Amino acid sequence: MNKELLNCERVWLNVTPATLRSDLADYGLLEPHALGVHEGRIHALVPMQDLKGPYPAHWQDMKGKLVTPGLIDCHTHLIFAGSRAEEFELRQKGVPYAEIARKGGGIISTVRATRAACEEQLFELALPRVKSLIREGVTTVEIKSGYGLTLEDELKMLRVARRLGEALPIRVKTTLLAAHAVPPEYRDDPDSWVETICQEIIPAAAEAGLADAVDVFCEHIGFSLAQTEQVYLAADQYGLAVKGHMDQLSNLGGSTLAANFGALSVDHLEYLDPEGIQALAHRGVVATLLPTAFYFLKETKLPPVAALRKAGVPMAVSSDINPGTAPIVSLRMAMNMACTLFGLTPVEAMAGVTRHAARALGEQEQLGQLRVGMLADFLVWNCGHPAELSYLIGVDQLVSRVINGEETLHG
């Protein structure tokens, strides 16, 4: 028996690894291997043909089943209260969003409901959403604030996100998105809201250890380039990574700004220009594609996938779960839409929810690949090829999931 395997607490024999390793082509598929875990990390990955008994005490034969890294949903807004179903109905009848917003709908309706909910209520509302992702194979999820838009309500959302990670078998990364919209109280003075974010909310979130990163919605209906820079400077002062909702509805130059700040990722990108693409490529910033929002809003302007591919920009894929523009709680569906709507290959979609999604969260040294030394987050699938994970939607193919070396039986 291989010495490294003998040192493992658990060994999975006869797995077919789709490693998603950056140094291997396509899915990084290997012949049947034994995968050993020690102290929460992948400790050994050994070809079956090189093994001789005896096997360690805790082993199981997976009979050739496909194993992939755990899926990573790197952009969600899944903590919220209230429903926008009536708004959806009105929009299908042709009522413009501006009119809906004037009547109290839109994002501010979610803000009102989220402010009114206590932490326990928000936790209970978010619980089934996260459990749905877990059932699909998500082992890491990013959760943003952004529906509180006061100091206490933004922190409340972040506390709920942390609690979800403690209560469920999933790793949660948190992002402060106080610069999501201008709250009603600051409608006539948005610069004062930006000052509040920079001088009060970011310091409080950082000091409480509630935020892993800071995000800004940089758009003509959101925050200007100058305001975005202010928020990024404040985040940098507190040692927080930055991200950006960029170039979804127009191009303000936000992606270039974010790249200059060394952002982890810029997200949406339908209006990304060549200058922005080169900036992302130069700084190694991840382009996160959100096809569910594109689909739900019936957009027609596609993100420049071919240009991103040519420039070598890593492309992540995420669900963008939110009540207004992407009420679709399915990373697997986002993978499918990334292929069918945006033209990604299934290999790119799979890399987009593993290796590149890990980079979008700053976790590329720990997550997103099956590689010795990385955290033991992986999935066992009842399917013959990893392309099925982007192709066949709505069928439960997950056999089991492992996070930090601990197996969670599926179901």
UniProtKB/Swiss-Prot annotation:
Q: Where does Zn(2+) bind?
A: 75, 77, 245, 320
- Where, in this chain's numbering, is N-formimidoyl-L-glutamate bound? 147, 322, 324
Tell me, what's a Pfam family for it? Amidohydro_1
Keyword field contains Zinc: yes
Cellular component aspect of the GO annotation: cytoplasm
> Pathway, per UniProt?
Amino-acid degradation; L-histidine degradation into L-glutamate; N-formimidoyl-L-glutamate from L-histidine: step 3/3
What positions does the entry give for Fe(3+) binding?
Answer: 75, 77, 245, 320
What Enzyme Commission number(s) does the record list for this chain? Answer: 3.5.2.7
Cofactor comment: Binds 1 zinc or iron ion per subunit.
Annotated residues for binding of 4-imidazolone-5-propanoate: 84, 147, 180, 248, 325
The prosthetic group or cofactor this protein requires is: Zn(2+); Fe(3+)
| Localization annotation | Cytoplasm
**An example of a Gene Ontology BP annotation on this entry?**
L-histidine catabolic process to glutamate and formamide
Keyword presence, Zinc = yes
Which catalysed reactions does the entry list for this protein?
Answer: 4-imidazolone-5-propanoate + H2O = N-formimidoyl-L-glutamate
Could you cite one Gene Ontology molecular function of this protein? Answer: iron ion binding
Q: What is its main location?
A: cytoplasm
Q: Which Gene3D superfamilies match?
A: Metal-dependent hydrolases, Urease, subunit C, domain 1
Q: Which UniProt keywords apply?
A: Cytoplasm, Histidine metabolism, Hydrolase, Iron, Metal-binding, Zinc
The protein's role, per its UniProt record:
Catalyzes the hydrolytic cleavage of the carbon-nitrogen bond in imidazolone-5-propanoate to yield N-formimidoyl-L-glutamate. It is the third step in the universal histidine degradation pathway.
Family statement drawn from the similarity comment of this UniProt entry: Belongs to the metallo-dependent hydrolases superfamily. HutI family.
Q: Which PANTHER family match?
A: IMIDAZOLONEPROPIONASE, IMIDAZOLONEPROPIONASE-RELATED
In its UniProt entry, what is this protein called?
Imidazolonepropionase
Which taxonomic lineage does the organism of this UniProt entry have?
Bacteria, Pseudomonadati, Pseudomonadota, Gammaproteobacteria, Aeromonadales
**What gene makes this protein?**
hutI
